[in-house]
Structure formats: structure tokens, C-alpha cells
Amino acid sequence: MARLPFNMPLLSVVIPTYNRPQFLARVLTYYAGLRFPYTIIVADSSAEPTAKANRQLANTLRHNLNLNYQYYAEDIHVADKITRALTLVSSPYVALGADDDFTVPASLKPGAEFLESHPDYAVVHGEAVYFVLRPGAYAHGAITGVGRYAQRTIEWSTGSERLIDHLTRYTTTFYSVHRTEQLRNNWQCAARLRLDYSFVELLPACLSLIQGKSKQLGGLHIVRQGHAGQTSRTKLPSVMDWIVDSAWFPQYSSIQDLLAKALTQQDGITEEQARLAVKQAFMRYLTDQVVAAEREQRGRQMMRLRLRESARRIPGLKKAWRAVRFLMPVRRNTVSLEAFLRRTSVFYGDFMPIYRAVTGVNDGG
């Protein structure tokens, strides 16, 4: 592996935040408790008095964290905010975070070292999971479930193949470890196009997969909170509302132009071939999103009906099933709340600090 210059920081984490002080306090306190070894840049565009509280929190935690708090105007576009924060990163590798999610510190160094040793890769991540809190809870409370959040390895030799594969079964690369210069340039492209929130994450991810391969390593990397509603400007419309919006096609056309240009440079193909590849990739993406939305809606309806029927027929079923399930043997890499709370789980050591930060409980008992 190539050596970095002496004293150059390996990696940094950028956390955009907006009007969610409880989440920001939760994640920064988690990092402080673990003596997080890398620079954290907080990119805050909250309204007052939330911004004041966030600044005070950052000042309080600076003795435990290498923390750089940056304030931006409340109306700044998210792509502008991330781009400006990325210009402050001095390390060769970077990962974006979110104020309501947890990046596992132990996953970052292996990701950066993998990129250092593999110049044909642009994106690295580990296992990703999500957790759900009991109804009514916001930033703290009992965790009621844990599930796997899909991440992928994409290793085709051409940017066209990688782009098509990526959008055929889209998974986010937002939280992955990236090369700083590449990610900064990719977000600058998104900022210049003034994209809406449905497109703004897609473009940097697509550019990254054109520029290099994607690798999923072992180990827990990101633990996300799943919740239906939140105080944020980034709540996304349904896929059908997004497609039929009058702004959709002009933005898609701008993205197609940019991605086609990137493909001609990366693969040495004609502009016509590149535009066809982009079109094919987005057709597959939209098909996948529409099918997934329909499947999710049907699944929710069926689940509600089944739960109601079971609850009527068998009083106490839910409580009894949880008790029995906790006693059942599971594999060491199983993704479930019951599995994660067992010391035999490969995820136990990385998950428990997050569990404590969210629930205030020291163990799963």
C-alpha cells in the first residue's frame, strides 16, 4: 500500500444538519464517547435558536473531538452546503454522514486503506443496517427492530456497465468512503445544476460509479434510523409524483448531458453510445423504483391485515413471539435486533455503543 505523507490525516467525516439538534447531539455524543479519531466537519444551516444550540454543543465537545463547526445560511441548497464543506477537507478520503445516523468508526480506516491500494475503485462501504424506534419516539427510546440496508459491490470494467448495474438495483453510496477530490468535484456538479432532492443524491453516486468500481467490505459501517416523518427539507415525493412533475425532464436532460460526457471520457466511446447507456440506466432505475413502491404499498396493506387478524385470534402473540425468538439460535452474522444484542454476534461490539446512545440502556437485557 502506498504511504501517505507524514502527519497527513487519513480521513474526514462531513455531517450536514438542518433543524434537528437532538439528532446532532446524539451522534456527536456517540462519537465523543468513542474518542472518534478523525476530523468531523459539521455543516449546519439550521435556523436560530437551533444553530446557537448546535454551536454550543460543538464547543462543549471539542475537547473530545477534532470538530470543525461551519454555519451556512438557512436557505442554502444542500448540494452547495456539502460542496463547501468538502472544500474544507484536507484528508485524501472522506465519508458523508447524517445527523440521525451513525457511522461505525472501525469501518472507516479499512475503507480508506482499500481505496489507497486499489486505484480503480471509487467507493467502499461495509454492512449497512437501519433501526426503528417505538411509536412516538424521536431521537431516543426503545429500539423495536433492526433490518439490513442493502449495499453492493459493482466491479464491471467499464463505466457504462457500472452505471447501468448501479441504477438497475440502486443502493445509496452517500455514506460510503470516497476519494475526497472525486467526491468534491461530483457534488460541485450537482450544485451547479440546482437539482431537486430526488436527483441531488443520484448524480454524485452515478459519477462515482462511472469513475471507478464499488466494493462492499465486511463489518458494520453505517447504522441508519428509519422513520416516516422528520423535520427536514429533504422529504422526498413519491416516485410517480416525482416523474410527472414539470421540473423532472429538464433536470434529467441536464444530468444525461453530464453523465454522457463523463462516460465518453471514461470509456472512450462516442457521445451517442454514452447517451444511450445513460438512457438505459435511468429506464431501469425508474422501473425498479415504481415496482418497489408498488410492492411496498401492497406489503404494508397485507401486513396490517395479518397483524390485526393474528392479534384478534391470539392475545399476547407479539410478546410471546419476541420472547421465543430471543432464545432461538442464530448465525453470528444474522441481522436482527435479537441477534445484535447477543455477544456472539459479529456486530455486537460495533452496535452496542449505538444501542446505548439511542436507548440509554447498557445492554440488551
Where are each of the predicted segments found?
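Conserved donor NDP-sugar-binding/catalytic core segment of glycosyltransferases
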Residues: 108-144
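Acidic donor-binding segment of Leloir-type glycosyltransferases
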Residues: 29-70
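A conserved hydrophobic helix/loop-capping motif in glycosyltransferases and polysaccharide synthases
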Residues: 11-23, 27, 34, 43
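Active-site donor/metal-binding and catalytic loop motifs
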Residues: 129-131, 135-136, 174, 210-211, ...
